[in-house]
Amino acid sequence: GIAPMPVQRPIPVWFGGASVPAYQRMGRLADGWFPQVPPGERLDEARAVVDAAAVEAGRDPTAIAMEGRVSWNAGGLDTVVDHAGRWRAAGASHIAVNTMSAGFASVDEHIDALTAAAGALGVTPPR
């Protein structure tokens, strides 16, 4: 089993995928989704399929969360903030920041970068 159990009831189910059938499934069933494309025309097309499937299933498309992903790279914090802004403009409700390719040598460097990103993006700790 899962321990400790998540506090959310029911447990949120998030889907990822990059095909029309996957997008339709997300619209029918998912609490959230992980797009496999960046903001732009392809994301807009995917979102339209998710939204249409949600409506067809009697669901509110705006209730389906979306997580955008940004990577900390040579552009550093400025790039993270720029890319997160693009995801927000595209409707992302969540942003994941990946520091694994940043070239950091220690865990503390990753934590410092994520702390800086959280501050720059206006993220507050959960309560």
Regions found by a protein language model. Give the residues of each.
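Active-site-adjacent structural elements that line small-molecule/cofactor binding pockets in enzymes
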Residues: 1-127
